[in-house]
Amino acid sequence: MIQMSSNDSSEVIRQCLQVLESITSDSSVPRNIRRSVNEIMDILNNESEPLFLRAASSISILEDISNDPNLPLHTRTLIWNLSSQLETIPVDE
């Protein structure tokens, strides 16, 4: 089993935040989805919570967003990729 160091997990979070930022600045994305993305960014930036808990909370919101019928296809793909990246963060950190 491959172990990720906390630096790897921090890098995953940093990359996810960059993608989330690009989604919030995309005017083709509906406002309710951009609000949810901002909420995810706040969760991921909240360092008072454990990293795995921030990732799990974010994945839950991403799953809700991905089911929105108004979500543009290119954004849906980004959201699936974000979810996959966040799932690589181990629970035991």
Swiss-Prot record:
It comes from the Archaea. SUPFAM superfamilies: Ta0600-like. InterPro entries: Ta0600-like_sf (IPR023130), UPF0147 (IPR005354). Pfam families: UPF0147. Belongs to the UPF0147 family. This is UPF0147 protein MM_1385. The lineage of its organism: Archaea, Methanobacteriati, Methanobacteriota, Stenosarchaea group, Methanomicrobia.
